[in-house]
Structures are given as C-alpha cells and as structure tokens.
Amino acid sequence: MGTNATKLETGTAGTLLQTGIERKIEPSNILILLDCSNTMQLALDGSTGVPEERLAAAKNVLKGTLRTIPSDVKVGLRIFGNSNLRDDSCKQTFLLVPIGLHNRGEIVAKAERLKPRGLTPLAYALKEAAADFEGLPGERHIILISDGADTCHQDPCVFIRKLRELGFKMRVDVIGVDKKAKIAEGWQLECIAKESGGKYFEADTAAKLGDAINQSVLEAISQKAADHNVSGQVMPRPAELRASPPHKLEKSK
C-alpha cells in the first residue's frame, strides 16, 4: 500500500491557503467524507489506544483546516459507519451538513460528537455523496478520510468508473490513515483516487493528515490546479443516484 501516495512538503499547502492563491473563476464545492467505522478508534500508527486515535485526530485537524478554507467555498460533511452492528449497517451513511456556505461551525460541532463504530460501507457512501452535489454549479470535490476498504462486499471503484462512463465528473482525493492496511485495502483506496482523477495521500500522523487535507483543498480551489480538476456545470444526477436527507444525530449517552 502507498506506492502511489502523493508526497507532501510539510506545511506548504496550509501556508498557501492562509497567504492567498490565484483562485479559479468556477465555484468549488467540497464534501468531506469521513470514515467513522469501528477501526477508526485505533491509533494512526495502527496500534490501539491513545494518543492519536484516527477519528479523534481527524476531528481535531478539521477544526483547524476549516478555518483556512476561503469563506466563499461551499463545504459539507458526510459520514459513514458510526452505528452499532445491525441489519442495515451497510447503509449507514449520513449527510450531517449539506454542502453550503457559513456552516464551518456546524461542521465542527457535529463532527465533535462522532464516535467510531460499525462497518465500512464505502461504496454506498460514495454513491450517496455523489447525489449531495445535485443542483450545485461548479466542481465536485470529495475529500475522503478512511482507514481501509469497503467491508460490505461492494467495490467502490466500480461505482466511480460508472460515474465516469455516465459523464458525471466528481474528483475524490483519498487520505489513507492506516499505513499498515492490507494490500487489498490500500489498492481500493488508491483506485478510488485514480479512477476519479484525484490523489491518494498517506497520513500516519495528525500533522500529515492536516497537510493532506490542506493540499486537497488547495487543489480544489486554486487556478494552478484547474487543468487537472473536474469541470462543473449543473448536471442532473444519474438515475443510479439517490440522495438521503440530512441526518440529525441523537444526543450521545
């Protein structure tokens, strides 16, 4: 795993976001797709326990990186997993915060309540995520943070290829937070990025996770990267896609 991971120079993307970059004319829409499955309670180095639990590190990093994203960029949050094992565990994905403006505080607040549990319905989550962009002009850009492959016997790469065949352009940058994941899992995550025209990053520390998110955002909004990103008119969603309503989490006990 990780042979094709994008190499990052620590801190460069975050600095560029803060100091200013040449922006695209076309609007950018960014959806953070966050893995909340059971294994996200493990440490970033693959061992159990503290100090850098994968989901906790992701939530902490998001607090900082969201502040660096320009206020006119639309951002949203969808999660998958985050449920006790049951018959419908392979359909557990929720749009917690729809893609929009002036919602950074809401994203941070709702992310803070998340706990790692359940399976990894990655393919189903990507299908639902694609529908989240319906009606939005501009580019579709997903930042997927995950520690492994789909555990619901689905292949997300098949779905991404299908979208491409249908002419539905959606870039997925993938941040893998388990450096010790099995080869098959690493291949699946890298495949999602490759097939969508995105990039794959490895992040085994909180610092690397932050750099990867900043780099992905930079790619989404900078004019320099425009030729590599997917173009964005308002397109009707393919018939295969259906959207779920925003989900309200019940208070944690």
Language-model features, listed with the residues they occupy:
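DG-centered beta-turn motif at the end of beta-strands
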Residues: 34-37, 58, 77, 129, ...
